[in-house]
């Protein structure tokens, strides 16, 4: 299957999607460069859309917001990868295990990036889009089998990974907003 089919599968049916991702053996670098980074570019470009329906938003504000959003999600991947591999060193003992952890983080972040793109394209702060972020923990929980997390560590891993995936990009975005804007 292609990367985009994997993304669709993991979003629509996480349990099946993680199985498909496991079987597809698409290298993490390819997912990063063919899907994640292009989606981050679309996210950055979507920051210009509010200029069309709100005349008070300037080009420079949109540009800085786009740069901040791009880097907040881009850095989130690497920070979460470092934190998860230090919290759970057994998940990065082999190259295959490291690739699965990378896929787990990437596909979950791709879901969040798609939500942020949708949010930026809507003319108003449409709160139900933010509630869709609560679907991420379900996707993350279903992905624990993909990573072969031991049964006794599933809930702790699920809680830590869900919190990192949800909070870190938002915290970095807030930081960039304070520093840049």
Language-model segments: residues:
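Hydrophobic alpha-helical transmembrane segments and adjacent short intramembrane/lumenal linkers
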Residues: 85-87, 91-170
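Short, intrinsically disordered/low-complexity patches at protein termini
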Residues: 43, 52-53, 136, 178-181
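Generic detector of short alpha-helix boundary/capping microenvironments
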Residues: 1-2, 132
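Membrane-helix interface and helix-disruption motif detector
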Residues: 56-61, 123-127, 181
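Selected alpha-helical membrane-embedding segments in polytopic membrane proteins
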Residues: 2-96
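Juxtamembrane boundary at the C-terminal end of a transmembrane helix
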Residues: 168-181
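Intrinsically disordered, low-complexity regions enriched in small/polar residues
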Residues: 38, 76, 137, 180-181
